[in-house]
Swiss-Prot record:
Organism annotation: Arabidopsis thaliana
InterPro entries: MADS-box/MEF2_TF (IPR050142), MEF2-like_N (IPR033896), TF_Kbox (IPR002487), TF_MADSbox (IPR002100), TF_MADSbox_sf (IPR036879)
The UniProt record lists the keyword Nucleus: yes
Domain of life, source organism: Eukaryota
One MF term in the entry's GO annotations: DNA-binding transcription factor activity
The keyword DNA-binding is annotated on this UniProt entry: yes
Domain MADS-box: 3-57
Principal localisation: nucleus
Localization in the cell: Nucleus
Function (record text): Probable transcription factor.
Protein name listed in UniProt: Agamous-like MADS-box protein AGL13
Length: 244
């Protein structure tokens, strides 16, 4: 009958914990020795107890094993660093080639370095330029249409604002006129002013009429007086002739 599964957790009882440590330590050292003998492996084991006591096992020496460990670790780090460096160099080379290709393409698009290009390359470049020109014109047309639509929208908004202000102004003027008609003080003042203006105008008209009548009478009087003088002169002439 096998033993039950032991739960792996810290043993709280100090004595029990010390006994378990002693038994497990001996078993672990035995296993390390067996592994080194059976498999011809370099094995080193270092154990520190709770009290700080050192226990060790090594078939070749703990110091030698530690030195070998550091050498292997440094080599691994160097290998990893070398691989990383080589990978970075390859990436830089790829990016440099891509940059040079893009720079050469840009020069070709602006009409530079065309001497060494073949007919096929020139035809390809021509198609690219035509496509770029078509796309540019299309985008330009779209931007202009959007700007025109925006201007129309602003024009409509300004027209609405203008109509609204016009209606508000007309309504304000109409209300002011209504208030003027409904206010008795203002109405009386307006009537008085109107009466004064009418009287003044009538007075001016009467003066003009009187002046006209006076002028007519004076002319008539002068004409009548002239006739009397003429008649008197004629009478005097007649009397003189009679005496003669």
């Amino acid at each position: 009958m096998g033993r039950g599964k032991v739960e792996v957790k810290r043993i709280e009882n100090k004595i029990t914990r010390q006994v378990t440590f002693s038994k497990r330590k001996s078993g672990l050292l035995k296993k390390a020795y067996e592994l080194s003998v059976l498999c011809d492996a370099e094995v080193s084991l270092i154990i520190f107890s709770t009290g700080g006591k050192l226990y060790e096992f090594s078939n070749v020496g703990v110091g030698r094993t530690i030195e070998r460990y550091y050498r292997c670790k440094d080599n691994l780090l160097d290998n990893d660093t070398l691989e990383d460096t080589q990978g970075l160099r390859q990436e830089v080379t790829k990016l440099k080639c891509k940059y040079e290709s893009l720079l050469r393409t840009h020069r070709n698009l602006v009409g530079e370095d065309l001497e060494g290009m073949s007919i096929k390359e020139l035809q390809t470049l021509e198609r690219q330029l035509e496509g770029a020109l078509s796309a540019t014109r299309k985008q330009k047309t779209q931007v202009m249409m959007e700007q025109m639509e925006e201007l129309r929208r602003k024009e409509r908004e300004l027209g609405d604002i203008n109509n609204k202000l016009k209606l508000e102004t007309e309504d304000h003027d109409f209300k002011g006129f209504q208030d003027l008609l409904l206010n008795p003080v203002l109405t009386a003042g307006c009537s008085t002013d109107f009466s004064l203006q009418s009287t003044h105008q009538n007075y001016i008209s009467d003066c003009n009429l009187g002046y006209f009548l006076q002028i007519g009478f004076q002319q008539h009087y002068e004409q009548g007086e002239g006739s009397s003088v003429t008649k008197s002169n004629a009478r005097s002439d007649a009397e003189t002739n009679f005496v003669q």
